[in-house]
UniProtKB/Swiss-Prot annotation:
Name of the molecule in the record: Substance-P receptor
Principal localisation: membrane
Gene3D superfamilies cross-referenced by the UniProt entry: Rhodopsin 7-helix transmembrane proteins
Residue positions with a glycan: 14, 18
Native source species: Homo sapiens (Human)
Top-level division of the source organism's lineage: Eukaryota
UniProt topology in membrane: Multi-pass membrane protein
């Protein structure tokens, strides 16, 4: 997120043109109140919603799947950015005066890039996981430990990418106010600044969206456009339907992110083409609207999960059960939905390889949690009743194979 704040300083053209001029971006009180209400909605909805998402996944063993760990990372990044940067962005954009000191100036320009990087590459990791599970079902899947390592690598790369902008951030005292700005090394045509901003835009927007778009296109063709050979039982179609729902949900999440951030990146690349853009009187209102849209991307995912996924909906209902207009629902579904799947897995082993190996991110008939209980031959004996010894052995071996490819 190059410039969420870096170029906040550029919003005031007098920073780079005439540091003795007073702040020319002043708006009536009623506009400030309306914008304040709009930004407050983002902070409250994002922080509360994403914290509930993290609780739903981490507090329920059946929800601790590999891909759900990436959703936890996504929720953490978005809640953090909403909590630490949205209000500061708003106050600085409205008053064009920095109240928070040098340290927070550096953090303010540094953290949003890291958070957006972590968010989009968490979505990329989910897309890659879906791609491998559906297109290459027999390939080894990430373990819980490997998933945590990937998340750590994402954050290390995010911090490295954001470091230059934080390092060169500084405050400057003017006759009537203090501003937070970025002092890039001197070079003709601001080459360092341009190269950095273009690289950041490519790395946190266009490149990951290209990868995600390819992955979900191939997955979509496989799940919707192709006739999948094998057993055509109701159980089989039920599982494929569940997988389609999850892919639809993640596509909505990615498209929402892309739509929210596109105007922001365009806004901060245009001045390299038209340097006088920030001198326009209307630019502050345009910036506030574009920044609100970008920041609002942090609050939509919990709403999407709640609307499109049954198990998240149960979790949200339980979290807000104290509200008079919300019914708690069957909270046990969060823990028990996977149990039925576990008990019946052996009996549906004969369906196609795709059915036994595709796993979903969340919802009924999902992948088993990495740290969840594993099925044992004895549990299969309970479902097969008085089967012969040879039948029991066959079912045990079949289930063992199925469990291996699902994990």
């Amino acid at each position: 997120m190059d410039n969420v704040l870096p170029v906040d300083s550029d919003l005031s053209p007098n920073i780079s043109t005439n540091t003795s001029e007073p702040n020319q971006f002043v708006q009536p009180a009623w506009q400030i109140v309306l914008w304040a209400a709009a930004y407050t909605v983002i902070v409250v909805t994002s922080v509360v919603g994403n914290v509930v998402v993290m609780w739903i996944i981490l507090a329920h063993k059946r929800m601790r799947t590999v891909t759900n760990y990436f959703l936890v990372n996504l929720a953490f990044a978005e809640a953090s950015m909403a909590a630490f940067n949205t209000v500061v962005n708003f106050t600085y954009a409205v008053h064009n005066e920095w109240y928070y000191g040098l340290f927070y100036c550096k953090f303010h320009n540094f953290f949003p890039i890291a958070a957006v990087f972590a968010s989009i590459y968490s979505m990329t990791a989910v897309a890659f996981d879906r791609y491998m599970a559906i297109i290459h079902p027999l390939q080894p899947r990430l373990s819980a430990t490997a998933t945590k390592v990937v998340i750590c690598v994402i954050w290390v790369l995010a911090l490295l990418l954001a470091f230059p902008q934080g390092y060169y951030s500084t405050t400057e005292t003017m006759p009537s106010r203090v501003v937070c700005m970025i002092e890039w090394p001197e070079h003709p045509n601001k080459i360092y600044e341009k190269v950095y901003h273009i690289c950041v835009t490519v790395l946190i927007y266009f490149l990951p969206l290209l990868v995600i778009g390819y992955a979900y296109t191939v997955v979509g063709i496989t799940l919707w456009a192709s006739e999948i050979p094998g057993d055509s039982s109701d159980r089989y179609h039920e599982q494929v339907s569940a997988k389609r729902k999850v892919v639809k949900m993640m596509i909505v999440v990615v498209c929402t992110f892309a739509i929210c951030w596109l105007p922001f990146h365009i806004f901060f690349l245009l001045p390299y083409i038209n340097p006088d853009l920030y001198l326009k009187k209307f630019i502050q209102q345009v910036y506030l609207a574009i920044m609100w849209l970008a920041m609002s991307s942090t609050m939509y995912n919990p709403i999407i999960y709640c609307c499109l996924n049954d198990r998240f909906r149960l979790g949200f209902k339980h979290a807000f059960r104290c509200c008079p207009f919300i019914s708690a629902g069957d909270y046990e579904g969060l823990e028990m939905k996977s149990t039925r799947y576990l008990q019946t897995q052996g009996s549906v082993y004969k369906v196609s390889r795709l059915e036994t190996t595709i796993s979903t991110v969340v919802g009924a008939h999902e992948e088993e949690p990495e740290d969840g209980p594993k099925a044992t031959p004895s549990s299969l004996d309970l479902t097969s009743n008085c089967s012969s010894r040879s039948d029991s052995k066959t079912m045990t071996e079949s289930f063992s194979f199925s469990s291996n490819v699902l994990s």
